[in-house]
Amino acid sequence: MNIGYACINMQLSYPQKYGGKERGVKPITTGRSMIKRTFETKGVDYASEIALANAMDLDKIIDWNILNGYKFFRITSGLAPWKSEYEWKDLKDLKQIQMYLHSAGVKVDTHGVRITCHPGPFNVLTSPHEHVVENCVGDLTMHGETFDMMSLTRTPYNKINIHIGGAYGDKEKSMERFCKNFERLPDSVKTRLTVENDDKASMYSVKDLYHGVYERIGIPI
């Protein structure tokens, strides 16, 4: 049986509490971030430093996962803080970030570890509002670029999994918008995207997604 976990390695992130023999060592985490005021003050260079630290620790977490037999891992969506405000090419540490991401990707490929991600609920391709869709396309593109830097397969095996968003009073029209806006995504996202059903009756069931999304554009559920 293969097992895994999502995003936060409690033992490495909080060694004083959960670390056992790792007690006293520096936390290893991909959750470093900053508030907007800090970003506005310190700018993209500081974001680059945080992204590099997160990428370095992602590589270490992958090592730990392999050593401890974890074959599934959902990575954080926040490797680069405030990523909506800049491009990868703007980061002064990009080459090093790419190096650590590629290193992590080679390891998961060698050891058969499945990497996925689950972008946040603000990714709403069903939205009738253009600025919401634009932001969604940008955020999903960032995830696709991250997976490409890790050299992960462009297949649902390395899925970018999302809920499709609001129903806006008309599920059918909303799913039509989703399918239309799907075409705006780059191939790095299209080839990996999967959709997940909701647990509320007013939202999208597996049946809704099968007929309204999968049958139209073939996205796995």
Task: Report each predicted region and the residues it spans.
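Alpha/beta catalytic barrel-like cores
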Residues: 1-114, 123-137, 144-152, 156, ...
